[in-house]
Amino acid sequence: HMGVPFNTVQEWLKGYDASSITIGVVASHSSLQILHGARQEGFRTLGIAVGENRRRFYKAFPGADPDEWLMLEDYREMLDYAEWFREKNVIIVPHGSLVEYLGASNFRNLEVPTFGNRNILHWESSRALQRQWLEDGGCTMPKVVEDPHNIDGPVIVKYAGAKGGRGYFVARDYRDFRRNVDIEEAVSYTHLTLPTNGCV
């Protein structure tokens, strides 16, 4: 699905007050630098979050604490707030956590101006596509171990998606893998093989 047509985004932007742009971002580890940079450039900032814990966390980072918060029950509610975002001259700056929480398809259909190419986030949401892109570009890539039973030397194991910012560990064999991985957490994800994205 192609998402929002470019000429539609252009029409929305014609209605924006260029002197009063607000940079909106889903609050996660990925957004601290975005919020800090937006503030340094003189933009108002909007943090979008589910749960009060996020809000409290940002108070510890004065340069990255948003000017305003939009608190939601579920990130998919962003789709319902599109007109509200546009009325506030919001430009959404996407990042990996937004794709993880909202979904690439929902993001492509979000009726709000965004920074960058919406379709590139389809690649952001897929490790396999990222790998293909790098291999097609001639990059040498580490071997992927699909099945943890096949670990026969040191591998780096990484959780996929938003959990990927934490949860790295090294395993030497299957037993080591089992000792380190939180199986209960792994099973709660849609990809049962997510902790096997290891590299030699």
Language-model segments: residues:
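N-terminal phosphate-binding or glycine-rich loops at protein starts, especially the Walker A/P-loop
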Residues: 9-39
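Short beta-strand "acidic-cap" motif of Rossmann-like dinucleotide-binding folds
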Residues: 47
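Conserved N-proximal alpha/beta basic substrate-recognition cap immediately N-terminal to
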Residues: 50-156, 162-163, 173
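Conserved small/polar residues in nucleotide/adenosyl-binding loops
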Residues: 190-196
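Catalytic core of tubulin tyrosine ligase-like
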Residues: 184-186
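Glycine-rich phosphate-binding loop of ATP-grasp-fold ATP-dependent ligases
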Residues: 154-182, 192
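Positively charged, low-complexity intrinsically disordered leader regions
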Residues: 2-10
